[in-house]
A protein has these predicted regions:
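Family-specific signature for flavin-dependent thymidylate synthase
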Residues: 1-223
Length: 223
């Protein structure tokens, strides 16, 4: 498990299906061929497939993760739909105490006036004061939520007062190809820093299981 942000967020690899050889044999079936062990020619084939956008062999390997991230990060992550299946904790059914991501003062980045979205790498001038404001707001939101539950308000209604900084947790299964597309976009320097952290953690775990394929895919995406 890789802890992220304030230590409450995480990425955990639960399971994988296949390996680099799975990609090779998915491609070689066109010629009724099969490799038993990885050889240099197989590594060259994987690189060729990635370089020339022959993506279907990379759909066969699958990975399953458990992730915990702030809702506002998750909603960006969930924009990636093709090749993924997700099941998320539902606050219609769960009413335990919420957890929120409280960004440290150095993460309260300044708005970039030259961009429609994004931020400068530098924190705002009054970062410590704003940090205190956010902390107080989160505590009040959670207190209000718990007060609504005490008044017998249904969790599906009471959850409406909770902030986007609240953590959510989900299980996600995706193909190697799908994760390559996701990471290519979310590892970009222009992506939000918080989602870059999750993409980086996922990328490292994938590379450990699919080293040849992942290097080929990420290199191709960076071109």
């Amino acid at each position: 498990m890789t802890k992220l942000l304030d230590g409450l967020g995480f990425v955990e690899l639960l399971d994988t299906f296949g390996d680099d050889l799975t990609v090779v044999n998915a491609a070689r079936v066109s010629f009724a061929k099969e490799s038993v062990v990885m050889e240099p020619k197989d590594e060259k084939l994987i690189k060729y497939l990635a370089d020339h956008h022959h993506t279907t062999p990379f759909f066969h390997p699958q990975l399953r993760f458990r992730l915990k991230m702030p809702i506002y990060v998750a909603r960006e992550w969930f924009r990636h739909t093709v090749g993924f299946a997700r099941n998320e904790v539902s606050r219609r059914y769960v009413d335990d105490k919420p957890e929120c991501y409280l960004p440290p003062p150095e993460s309260l980045r300044e708005r970039d006036a030259n961009k429609k979205q994004g931020s400068k790498p530098t924190p705002i001038e009054n970062a410590t004061g704003v940090h205190t404001i956010i902390k107080a707001f989160q505590e009040q939101a959670i207190a209000t939520y718990e007060a609504l539950l005490e008044q017998k308000v249904a969790p599906e209604v009471a959850r409406g007062v909770l902030p986007q900084s609240m953590y959510t947790e989900f299980i996600e299964t995706g193909s190697l190809s799908a994760y390559a597309r996701l990471c290519a976009l979310r590892l970009d320097p222009h992506a939000q820093a918080e989602i870059q952290a999750y993409a980086s953690a996922v990328s490292k775990l994938i590379e450990e299981r699919f080293p040849v394929s992942w290097r080929a895919l990420i290199h191709e995406a960076a071109e």
